[in-house]
Amino acid sequence: MSEELLQKEVSVPSISMMEQDAIGEVLNISMGSSATAVSSLLDRQVNISTPSVSVREFHTLDYSAMEPALIVKIEYVEGISGNNVMVFRQRDIQIILNLLMGNDDPPSDDFEFDELSMSAACEVMNQMMGAAATALSEFLNRVVNISTPTASIVTSEDSYRDAIGVQEGDEIVAVSF
């Protein structure tokens, strides 16, 4: 599965390689917990790859392979500030939803999100991000709480920008797994 996690860093225009490595390590720990949570939900082994961290202007990201996609965004409401945005290809979310329903069918080209599938996807992401927040809490030795996830379907760079809440020229820390 292809997924990309974006974290907007408003006050820090650039970060050092050591800071990028630290972000990658922390996210590897927290996303490892997320993968475990999804493994439990799906009753399947879920693995994540080693994260790749970069600082870039939002408009330089190429989302063409991710369209259409589901974006799930959470905000940190306690312990740390910022937000996380997970971007999933529609095909990957369909696989997750099929497995949740005990269905091993391959993804369908005519799949469209409806209210039920969006709600189910948000609940899966809530479980993932809740597990990640718990791992961050343990790592940082402080309480880390998140908002309820919000989800958006995106089909273009403009809809990505609107869903994530960035402006033209904003720098983000992009982490790909």
Enumerate the language-model features and the residues they cover:
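Composition-driven recognition of glycine/serine/threonine/acidic- and proline-rich low-complexity segments
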Residues: 2-177
